[in-house]
């Protein structure tokens, strides 16, 4: 079983759901991004999702785009992502998933990326613009290295796509709660509940919901039917406005919503 799946199973055993927290590597600088990720884990975040800055982030909303563009402007390089993963995993036990668009992985070399990422202590990849039937190289590399592979499913996904995604994901399936780009929303789209049910019918062992979650109440709402809640923009905003301490405080607030019952 994967480290991420182990974490989700442990939280289920504690009558709780998994809280997954996203931050971009290198924002506002590499050192601070590492310290912030550690602070999330120390304040109740179960799995760290570390975003690799990319020049064409088609799924990211304004908050995350601004953060990743600042990281790139400051000179972020892919090797910095591996260094960040290495230090985070040396300081906390929470597994670290990297969210990356596929082009940087291809440019680096899929096998080389998998090897270097696994050596750094990474748990797996979330690949928003890669679908399983176009990812044969990644499927092979992840099998060889034992890395998790988290594919996305949306409310618009066909039954065939949901089955393919469920069959090829390891760790969990990322259920996109609403159509569109990332960002804080007042209400988490009700389509997420239906999507998670359909993913379970398709064979998904675990499904975690992301896009739009920003409060403990929304975390609790999502964990009523999903295995994990993924929070990004709210944490990035806290880091941008108040630094590491603020990100930790928001993480602690969100974690209160992860306890069921």
Swiss-Prot record:
CC annotations in GO: cytosol
Alphabetically ordered keywords of this record: Amino-acid biosynthesis, Aromatic amino acid biosynthesis, Lyase, Tryptophan biosynthesis
EC number, UniProt record: 4.2.1.20
Catalysed transformations (reactions): (1S,2R)-1-C-(indol-3-yl)glycerol 3-phosphate + L-serine = D-glyceraldehyde 3-phosphate + L-tryptophan + H2O
Family annotation (HAMAP family): Trp_synth_alpha
Function: The alpha subunit is responsible for the aldol cleavage of indoleglycerol phosphate to indole and glyceraldehyde 3-phosphate.
Subunit structure: Tetramer of two alpha and two beta chains.
Protein's recorded name: Tryptophan synthase alpha chain
């Amino acid at each position: 079983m994967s480290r991420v799946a182990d974490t989700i199973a442990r939280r289920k055993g504690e009558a709780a759901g998994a809280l997954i927290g996203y931050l971009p590597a290198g924002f506002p600088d590499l050192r601070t991004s590492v310290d912030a990720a550690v602070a999330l884990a120390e304040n109740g975040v179960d799995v760290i999702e570390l975003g690799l800055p990319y020049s064409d982030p088609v799924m990211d909303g304004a908050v995350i785009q601004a953060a990743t563009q600042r990281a790139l402007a400051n000179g972020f390089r892919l090797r910095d992502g591996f260094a960040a993963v290495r230090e985070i995993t040396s300081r906390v036990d929470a597994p670290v998933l990297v969210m990356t668009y596929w082009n940087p992985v291809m440019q680096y070399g899929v096998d080389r990326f998998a090897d270097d990422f696994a050596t750094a202590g990474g748990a797996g990849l979330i690949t928003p613009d890669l679908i399983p039937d176009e990812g044969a190289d990644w499927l092979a590399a992840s099998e060889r290295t034992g890395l998790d592979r988290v594919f996305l499913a949306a409310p618009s996904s066909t039954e065939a796509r949901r089955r393919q995604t469920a069959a090829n994901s390891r760790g969990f399936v990322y259920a996109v709660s609403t159509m569109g780009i990332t960002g804080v929303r007042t209400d988490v789209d009700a389509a997420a509940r239906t999507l998670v049910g359909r993913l379970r019918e398709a064979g998904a062992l675990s499904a975690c919901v992301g896009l739009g979650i920003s409060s403990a109440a929304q975390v609790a709402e999502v964990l009523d039917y999903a295995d994990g809640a993924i929070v990004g923009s709210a944490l990035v905003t806290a880091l941008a406005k108040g630094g590491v301490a603020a990100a930790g405080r928001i993480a602690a607030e969100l974690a209160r919503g992860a306890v069921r019952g």
